[in-house]
From Swiss-Prot:
Principal subcellular localisation of the protein: secreted
Region listing for Disordered, in residue ranges: 38-77
Highest taxon, organism lineage: Eukaryota
Originating species: Plasmopara viticola
Biological role stated in the UniProt entry: Secreted effector that dos not suppress the host cell death induced by cell death-inducing proteins.
Compartments where located: Secreted; Host nucleus
Location of the motif RxLR: 27-30
Secreted as UniProt keyword: yes
Similarity comment text for this entry: Belongs to the RxLR effector family.
Gene Ontology, cellular component aspect: extracellular region; host cell nucleus; post-mRNA release spliceosomal complex; U2-type spliceosomal complex
Glycosylation, residue list: 59
Entry comment, domain topic: Has the canonical translocation RxLR motif, but lacks the canonical EER motif, which characterizes most oomycete effectors identified so far.
Signal peptide boundaries: 1-19
Protein name: Secreted RxLR effector protein 100
Amino acid sequence: MRYLLLTFFTFHCQMVADALPRAKRLRLLREAKARKESGEGKIEEAGMIVTTGAPTPENETMEHNEVPQSTTDTDQKSEEIVEKIAQVQEEGANTEDESDEELLNLAPKRANWDMERDIAPMLRKLERRTQHAIVEILRTCDLKQ
């Protein structure tokens, strides 16, 4: 059972990793590294914020109705991240549309789906010439012998 769960988890993680293009992953890794160096925390690929370090005694004794400053900062950061993700998704949609247009421009102006039918008259003419050339070669060989 553990093997099955581990396999599923690994497969799921691989699918998530493949879903993001390489450039986006690299950009997210660079941002995470910069945040880690500055001590703010790190961002996972899913866009969730994970704080670094152990919980402090101040946070444990704080009352539930108080809102710590770090929570509001986290909320602002999460909103910024959501906006960035939405912007990246819009850019991705634009590039997909542009790539479809480029593929349509590469298509020939006149569709030649049935190549055999289009080339058949030329092939008949070429076959006829080939047969005449073979006959002439055989005649010249017979005359020499």
